[in-house]
Amino acid sequence: MRQDPFGRQQPSPGRGRRVGGLRIGILLLFAAYGAYYYFSNRTEDPVTGQKVLIDRSLSVDDEKSLGLQAYQEILSQERPVDPSLPISQEIRGIADRLIAKVDDVEAALAAEHGMQPTRFSQTFEWEVNVIDSDQANAFCLPGGKMAVYTGLVPVAQNENAMAVVMGHEIAHALLRHGAQRMAQQRLTQVGQMAGAMSGMDPQQQQMVMAAMGYGYLLPYARKHETEADEVGLMLAAAACFDPREAVPLWERMGQSGGGESAPEFSSTHPNPGTRIQNLQALMPKALEYRERFCEQAM
Ligand SMILES: [Zn+2]
């Protein structure tokens, strides 16, 4: 063995390779677990025809109770508007019309992919509250718990546009986007753990995570937005609202969402120009859905 003048031992080449091998071994183990998790939890969503990742150990009931818990927490922190006031009744009226068309629209979209709908929203306990707030926001949690913020009313301007936003939110819950995000987070954690255990320094880890965010998680979130736009538009059209209001609505939304943005309308939302192009492309189909499912004479 070579000895340096200060008496320190040179690391022998064999040892270095062993450490490197261990690192790669750990990374491979995590990669194998990640791949196993990914492939064993993938299903096809009949409504979108897309392969999605939802943890099989998370039941619809678990998801509903998580939604309910979050809902109660939000309502206890915010200022819900008296349900007997006209604004609350109007919003509930829109919600009821949309909810009444969920089964028809799910079945029609699933049929386009040659599939049967899951009808998993059958067990939803729908509820809608109006929250007194400046935010131009709305949400629908797993299990059908919805809220519309009063700040959305002047941006929506009319019931057709309001129905487009609420349809979009309902679609997120129907498509189980929350559960999909949870599965994504699980995979991200596996990646983080692998990074930490294989001895990546925090800076390297951050770089990898940032790359994943831009390359993988963010487009994934945008895809959810695009899916919710489509399913929501079909719901609004089937419930006899005018889907063409979607275009001016998202234009107004783009203008109002300058500085502060609420969680739902954050950077995960598609670029406004792309979104409007997508909506315009969907318009013939939306009008066809209205023809088919709206019993009201136009
Ligand atoms: Zn959304």
Regions found by a protein language model. Give the residues of each.
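Peri-catalytic and regulatory segments of divalent metal-dependent proteins
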Residues: 3-15, 38-170, 174-186, 239, ...
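Membrane interfacial helix-start segments of signal peptides and signal-anchor transmembrane helices
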Residues: 15-23
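Hydrophobic membrane-insertion alpha-helices, especially the h-region
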Residues: 23-37
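Metalloprotease/metallohydrolase-associated module, dominated by Zn2+-dependent proteases
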Residues: 61, 199-248, 263
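Generic alpha-helical structural context detector
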Residues: 96, 164, 189-192, 196, ...
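Short, small/polar residue-rich loop motifs at catalytic or cofactor-binding pockets
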Residues: 160, 222, 283
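Post-HEXXH active-site segment of zinc metalloproteases
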Residues: 178-210, 247-250
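Extracytoplasmic and endomembrane cell-envelope/extracellular-matrix remodeling and assembly machinery
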Residues: 229, 242-298
